[in-house]
């Protein structure tokens, strides 16, 4: 098979939610404010047997968790640890997993109702399994033709829905020998770094979102600055599906969105995940943008992922 890679090393992890993380200035060193620990009631750092120390992934967010077999039911302690890491770091990486599509679906269902697949064809007709995403054509060979161009632009998943997803997870099945990364932009950090004048300018504005390739779906508007329902933290809610801003001339709104996107995707706000086979990565759609990176020969190497999306709530 072309494009094999080694499995991920086994770092370790557990992190908890600390409001101090949201007072950081971009560029601050990574320290305990960014990656606080969870402590169990008896004062021990390890939240459950088999977990080690946290491995922070970048100042922009992300943490790696080991010692968890996602193919097995989650204990209350493990679920609580994952929830805390997810809220604190926005991105959680579980390396060295071995999951069927059914097992991935069941893991995703721990976090809420799992959405049905948008494409009801071939391998994705069944509900109750993870959705197959790949660069493969009908004959099983790599091709750029079936890659969605929108995936290579900064976006959050399904913002053109009245209640966009709360989280997305991808599980790496086949990868090119190098490249095929996914980048994540931390919109909470990006918002916190805006000048106060810009924050006042965009307060109360609503952005209009449309799907990139479906002209029949009605547009939906959401707050340009949304509040996280679990943490209360504000973040920008933008991306390539946002077309204009309600109440502003279309050109002015588009220019403002472009300026915000440029500010929000500076390298200091971005974590780039370099995939390894067996990685399962889950991220918070309420506080992040993401994009695929075509930094490999798309028409030569296979890239196959399994995807699950968990339903969210109406942004406010």
Which functions belong to the PLM regions below?
Residues 1-22:
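Intrinsic disorder/low-complexity segments
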Residues 22-280, 285-316:
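Non-heme Fe(II) oxygenase catalytic core, chiefly the N-lobe of the double-stranded beta-helix
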């Amino acid at each position: 098979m072309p494009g094999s890679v080694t499995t991920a090393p086994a770092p370790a992890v557990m992190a908890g939610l600390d409001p101090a993380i949201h007072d950081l200035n971009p560029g601050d060193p990574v320290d305990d404010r960014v990656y606080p620990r969870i402590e169990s009631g008896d004062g021990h750092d390890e939240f459950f047997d088999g977990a080690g120390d946290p491995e922070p992934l970048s100042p922009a967010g992300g943490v790696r968790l080991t010692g968890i077999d996602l193919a097995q039911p989650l204990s209350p302690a493990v679920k609580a640890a994952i929830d805390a890491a997810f809220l604190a770091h926005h991105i959680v990486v579980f390396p060295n997993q071995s999951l069927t599509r059914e097992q991935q679906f069941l893991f995703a269902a721990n976090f809420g109702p799992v959405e049905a697949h948008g494409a009801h064809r071939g391998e994705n007709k069944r509900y109750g399994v993870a959705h197959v995403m790949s660069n493969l054509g009908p004959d099983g060979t790599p091709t750029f033709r079936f890659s969605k161009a929108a995936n290579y632009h900064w976006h959050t998943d399904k913002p053109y829905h009245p209640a966009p997803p709360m989280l997305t997870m991808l599980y790496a099945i086949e990868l090119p020998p190098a490249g095929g990364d996914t980048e994540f932009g931390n919109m909470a950090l990006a918002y916190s770094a805006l000048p106060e004048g810009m924050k006042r300018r965009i307060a109360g504005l609503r952005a209009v979102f449309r799907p990139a390739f479906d002209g029949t779906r009605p547009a939906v508007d959401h707050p340009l600055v949304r509040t996280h329902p679990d943490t209360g933290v504000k973040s920008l809610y933008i991306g390539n599906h946002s077309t204009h801003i309600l109440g502003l001339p279309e050109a002015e709104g588009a220019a403002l969105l472009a300026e915000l996107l440029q500010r929000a995707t500076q390298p200091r706000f971005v974590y780039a995940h370099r995939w390894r086979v067996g990685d399962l990565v889950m991220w918070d759609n309420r506080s992040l943008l993401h994009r695929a990176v075509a930094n490999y020969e798309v028409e030569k190497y296979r890239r196959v992922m399994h995807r699950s999306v968990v339903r969210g709530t109406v942004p406010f």
